Amino acid sequence: MANTDRPALPHKRAVPPSRADSGPRRRRTKLLDAVAGFGVTLGSMFKKTVTEEYPERPGPVAARYHGRHQLNRYPDGLEKCIGCELCAWACPADAIYVEGADNTEEERFSPGERYGRVYQINYLRCIGCGLCIEACPTRALTMTYDYELADDNRADLIYEKDRLLAPLLPEMAAPPHPRTPGATDKDYYLGNVTAEGLRGVRESQTTGDSR
């Protein structure tokens, strides 16, 4: 039998919306919110654009930017790399692989005793730190401003020597070829060798001709 002594719970009546939340005032508020949202768009339309037209117009890079590596040449075309492997030892990411070989008088690629026969840089590992540049004793390895290294094939991101060597200038001869007559590997290192020949020899010849 049901207990009829319990007091009945008060009935909750739904609170009708106030007249302030409906009608013209509410519609005016919604309209102002929409206009405020478009105000941000309209205000940005007349500002200077920050979009860069890449890749049609590549943006500038910093003066000391660490981009793709380059194996440099001497002015006569011989390679600066001597295959010492110091760059590979200095690399913290183990991204460089070098195999050195001996030069001969019949087949000379660099002024010294050895040259880099195999040179690879794995750009899947390279972190662009530049420690390899600091370790190079002949300034053979530098970093360019080229930053477009993305590819859809992992194998193509392992750069071989032919892709790293600096292009031959018109006055250079493609190695292998003999050293400049009268020049030693020290003359090459000190920058005394030019595309025309050994600087000291050329200057003395010019002085003798003038006499």
From Swiss-Prot:
GO terms for molecular function: 4 iron, 4 sulfur cluster binding; iron ion binding; NADH:ubiquinone reductase (non-electrogenic) activity; quinone binding. It catalyses: a quinone + NADH + 5 H(+)(in) = a quinol + NAD(+) + 4 H(+)(out). Belongs to the complex I 23 kDa subunit family. It comes from Mycobacterium tuberculosis (strain ATCC 25618 / H37Rv). Keywords: 4Fe-4S, Cell membrane, Iron, Iron-sulfur, Membrane, Metal-binding, NAD, Quinone, Repeat, Translocase. NDH-1 is composed of 14 different subunits. Subunits NuoA, H, J, K, L, M, N constitute the membrane sector of the complex. [4Fe-4S] cluster 2 binds at residues 91, 126, 129, 132. The gene is nuoI. Its cofactor is [4Fe-4S] cluster. Its EC number is 7.1.1.-. Coiled coil: none annotated. This is NADH-quinone oxidoreductase subunit I. PANTHER family: NADH DEHYDROGENASE [UBIQUINONE] IRON-SULFUR PROTEIN 8, MITOCHONDRIAL (PTHR10849:SF20), NADH DEHYDROGENASE UBIQUINONE IRON-SULFUR PROTEIN 8, MITOCHONDRIAL (PTHR10849). Pfam families: Fer4_7 (PF12838). HAMAP family: NDH1_NuoI (MF_01351). NDH-1 shuttles electrons from NADH, via FMN and iron-sulfur (Fe-S) centers, to quinones in the respiratory chain. The immediate electron acceptor for the enzyme in this species is believed to be menaquinone. Couples the redox reaction to proton translocation (for every two electrons transferred, four hydrogen ions are translocated across the cytoplasmic membrane), and thus conserves the redox energy in a proton gradient. Residues 71-101, 117-146 form the 4Fe-4S ferredoxin-type domain. Its main location: membrane. It is a peripheral membrane protein. [4Fe-4S] cluster 1 binds at residues 81, 84, 87, 136. Residues 1-27 are annotated as: Disordered. It is found in: Cell membrane. GO terms for biological process: aerobic respiration.
